[in-house]
């Protein structure tokens, strides 16, 4: 599913990415947290891409993006719908793969994979439950250690998400 973001969603994503990046920079400088980023992109770019994915998913499933500022990240939960916790993973790699650095980092009920297609378009590739991910993942090393992965083709289409969480 391709979502064309509205200007106000793009602006909100940029705003919240800047707030998160600024807070993280201050806390890192004060020694309160450690930056665990492995990407060669800036913290702002990583947060911005993630928030674009979150806004696309929120619109597609009629949920609200959690923009609360947490001391050391959101713990994985990007939104909650009908009591179900959801983590949105926005992949910026050429191949569409849902990736967790560690298996225990999948600590929500569901994960949804997105990719940035253009400055205002986000593709939602599908979703998977925590249990199914644990049974179907494969490991892959992109040069910085093994990661836990499921290819987009193995995900359920986002159009079936309401059915999966019992809302239909």
Describe the predicted segments one by one.
Residues 1-82, 89-168:
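Nucleic-acid endonuclease domains
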